[in-house]
Amino acid sequence: MAKTSMKAREAKRAQLVAKFAEKRAALKVIIASPASSDEDRWDAVLKLQALPRDSSASRQRNRCNQTGRPHGFLRKFGLSRIKLREATMRGEVPGLRKASW
């Protein structure tokens, strides 16, 4: 089990990403645009740097919904490999079963 503080930190990051997504995207468009002047581009870079670090989507970490485990995470199910296996063995995941050949 992950610490409660780690789960809370990830929730806060998700909230910040959602809050600043539009602003961040608009600044990136200005930076990437060849039509924008050097001054506009530089201002956009400074504004982007002034945003909170945790508002960047790349700082988010996928975690298991049940345990908070960061490794072995399967996006399709939102669970770690361990919890997915347990749920599969109990028959809680429709259409999923242990491989046998």
Swiss-Prot record:
The answer, when asked if Zinc is one of the entry's keywords, is no
The family annotation for this protein states:
Belongs to the universal ribosomal protein uS14 family.
User: GO molecular function: any one?
Assistant: structural constituent of ribosome
- What GO cellular component entries does it have? cytoplasm; small ribosomal subunit
Superkingdom of the source species: Bacteria
Q: Which NCBIfam families match?
A: PRK08881.1 (NF006477)
**Functional description taken from the UniProt entry:** Binds 16S rRNA, required for the assembly of 30S particles and may also be responsible for determining the conformation of the 16S rRNA at the A site.
Keywords in UniProt for this one? Ribonucleoprotein, Ribosomal protein, RNA-binding, rRNA-binding
From the Swiss-Prot or TrEMBL record, give the protein name.
Small ribosomal subunit protein uS14
Q: Which organism is it from?
A: Shewanella oneidensis (strain ATCC 700550 / JCM 31522 / CIP 106686 / LMG 19005 / NCIMB 14063 / MR-1)
Report whether Ribosomal protein shows up as a keyword of the record. Answer: yes
Pfam families named among the record's database cross-references: Ribosomal_S14 (PF00253)
| GO biological process per UniProt | translation
How does this polypeptide assemble, per the annotation? Answer: Part of the 30S ribosomal subunit. Contacts proteins S3 and S10.
